[in-house]
Amino acid sequence: LDKDGKILMRMGSDMHVMPGEKRGCVGCHEVREGNSTPINSPSIAMSKAPARPTPPAWENDGILDYQKLIQPIWDKYCIECHSGPTPEGMVDMTGDRTRYFCMSYDNLIEREIVDYHNVFALGHDENTPKSLGSFVSRISEFIDTDEHSGKLLLDDEKRLIYTWIDANVPYYSTYQFTRPETRGVP
């Protein structure tokens, strides 16, 4: 992560690890062409002491829940202008429910205001640092300064938004709410 909490590089896939399970990176993070790194040549990361991540400021056990964590930021800073029948720029940032998500989420995705990894799209080749996620998301134009709205987001709020983007813009906090027939969290 950089100093603002934006991810420098990310994987094009995800993995789930249960408590007590261990996961290594051998297989993906090796030289693809040629010989592997010699065993007696430790990586930079392995030559340092383990670092314990700082728990996120938003609590919620670190679980990203759009309606619970992200929407309140839009409510605080955006809906004054971006709501109603003719929202500013025709971008509705309210939490009003849509078929699967809500107006703000749909607008951010459909208008490409946030960059995400569309798992259904083609062409997921290797990427370069700072080429995906929060680094290239247009939302930065609106939240990094107070020029857009005259309001300045708190650093923790910006970091939460960047984390949400770099986690690939999850909406539901658990799989329990990911089916159309479920109502999700009200």
Mark where each language-model region is.
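Aromatic- and Gly/Pro-enriched helix-to-coil junctions and flexible linker segments
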Residues: L1-P186
